[in-house]
């Protein structure tokens, strides 16, 4: 049985002694939705119509889908729904950034809209909390609760689009880029992140260029090696340290997949990817007198000498009880200059939304069950969240 058929069988199976649960059509890619319509005895092209209604027009009410006959609309209402996360809290920054706390079940995740002169980027979460325990990141301090479903991931894009007027309202810049850089490690939720990204790329849905959809990872190497077999999108690596000793400390997944192992995997991805222009983005948070010295810049240049890349230097954004300080502008500028002398393209990222805790590393959300991280430690050892990915 093919993956789509297996998925549909799972979605359509109902226990005889339990009420039927409606299928959330946002959990389905267009191909899976075509299988769904076949199961209903309908023509598969109806899926194309539904996907357009949901994502092109932002419609979640079957009755408003005027090119679908009433009989089919009634059938759909009986077995399916279109449901995206609702906004629990909205905060607007003085710089135009908007942060939403999106309600997903009993928990919340955070989604950030960042408008700029030539683009508008949406930062999307992939998990409730995060299990990787990066010491400089607010989300990691909240612990891990669960993976988000496809509908909870793509639903963030849908809800944000609905709010900002991405469905044809003039005067508002639409979402041009999506970055999987919100709460969570995307490569620990590949089963749901990849289908959500497929919907982002689908011309019947959002039709984003694969160069405008970016997946950021701290380095789950087996999943990264598999990613190119599933989808081609832009790649960003959360490196943050130029040597294993330091990275073991601040990005604990490095204890399982060290820098060389990670960079080798990145190079393999670049060799087969068309989405990256032959270059990967390296993310490097600047921590005062921790990883921002001249010696660190030289070490980083050595690590990346055979990897075509653009380096983003990220001024660290503080959160309560964090054991770090933000690097001074002088130290950041000196770090940048040193790397540029090696010929690297190095950009100092402008901090956006820090007045509403929407900046990089500040997303925390409302993680209710904080015991999951402890359970993962017991199951997988101290290398939290570095389980094998088949």
Curated annotation (Swiss-Prot):
The protein in question is named Dual-specificity RNA methyltransferase RlmN
Q: Which gene encodes it?
A: rlmN
Q: Which organism is it from?
A: Haemophilus influenzae (strain 86-028NP)
> HAMAP family under this entry?
RNA_methyltr_RlmN
Q: What does this protein do?
A: Specifically methylates position 2 of adenine 2503 in 23S rRNA and position 2 of adenine 37 in tRNAs. m2A2503 modification seems to play a crucial role in the proofreading step occurring at the peptidyl transferase center and thus would serve to optimize ribosomal fidelity.
Identify one Gene Ontology CC term for this UniProt entry: cytoplasm
This protein's UniProt keywords = 4Fe-4S, Cytoplasm, Disulfide bond, Iron, Iron-sulfur, Metal-binding, Methyltransferase, rRNA processing, S-adenosyl-L-methionine, Transferase, tRNA processing
PANTHER family recorded: 23S RRNA METHYLTRANSFERASE, RADICAL SAM CORE DOMAIN-CONTAINING PROTEIN
> Which Pfam families did the record assign?
Radical_SAM, RlmN_N
């Amino acid at each position: 049985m093919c993956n789509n058929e297996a998925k549909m069988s799972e979605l359509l199976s109902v226990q005889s002694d339990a009420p039927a649960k409606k299928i959330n059509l946002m959990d389905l890619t267009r191909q899976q939705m075509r299988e769904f319509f076949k199961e209903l005895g309908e023509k598969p092209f109806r899926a194309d119509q539904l996907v357009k209604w949901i994502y092109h027009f932002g419609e979640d009410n079957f009755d408003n889908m005027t090119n679908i006959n009433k009989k089919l609309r009634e059938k759909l209402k009986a077995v399916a729904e279109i449901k995206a996360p609702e906004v629990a809290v909205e905060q607007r920054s003085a710089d135009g950034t908007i942060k939403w706390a999106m309600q997903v079940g009993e928990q919340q995740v955070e989604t950030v809209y960042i408008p700029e002169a030539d683009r508008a980027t949406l930062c999307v979460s992939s998990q409730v909390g995060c299990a990787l325990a990066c010491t400089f990141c607010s989300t990691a301090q909240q612990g891990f609760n669960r993976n988000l479903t496809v509908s909870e991931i793509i639903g963030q894009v849908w809800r944000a689009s609905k709010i900002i007027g991405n469905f044809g309202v003039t005067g508002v810049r639409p979402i041009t880029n999506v970055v999987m850089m919100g709460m969570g490690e995307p490569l620990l939720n590949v089963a749901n992140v990849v289908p959500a990204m497929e919907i982002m790329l689908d011309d019947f849905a959002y039709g984003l260029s694969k160069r405008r959809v970016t997946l950021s990872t701290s380095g789950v190497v087996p999943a990264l090696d598999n990613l190119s077999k599933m989808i081609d999108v832009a790649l960003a690596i959360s490196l943050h340290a130029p040597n294993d000793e330091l990275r073991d400390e601040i990005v604990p997944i490095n204890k399982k997949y060290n820098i060389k192992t990670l960079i080798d995997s990145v190079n393999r991805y670049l060799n087969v990817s068309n989405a990256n222009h032959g270059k990967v983005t390296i993310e490097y948070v600047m921590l005062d007198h921790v990883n921002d010295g001249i010696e660190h810049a030289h070490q980083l240049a050595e690590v990346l000498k055979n990897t075509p890349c653009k380096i983003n230097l990220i001024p660290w954004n503080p959160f309560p009880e964090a054991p770090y300080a933000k690097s001074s502008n002088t130290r950041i500028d000196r770090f940048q200059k040193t790397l540029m002398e090696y010929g690297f393209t190095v950009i100092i990222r402008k901090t956006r939304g820090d007045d509403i805790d929407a900046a990089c590393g500040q997303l925390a959300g409302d993680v209710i069950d904080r015991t999951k991280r402890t359970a993962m430690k017991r199951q997988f050892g101290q290398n939290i969240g570095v389980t094998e990915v088949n």
